[in-house]
């Protein structure tokens, strides 16, 4: 399950659609292992750091 979540994170474009993709990834995360949620949190932290 985490594979589907990660595949939705990496190709994520830095556009106005980021907010929509974020909700989509969080929705998948709840159905996957903790590893998926951890990867999502890491990506969000990196996004805000770069932003």
From Swiss-Prot:
InterPro entries reported for this sequence: DUF468
Top-level taxonomic group: Eukaryota
Entry's family note: Belongs to the UPF0320 family.
Name of the protein described by the UniProt record: UPF0320 protein YOL166W-A
Source organism (scientific name): Saccharomyces cerevisiae (strain ATCC 204508 / S288c)
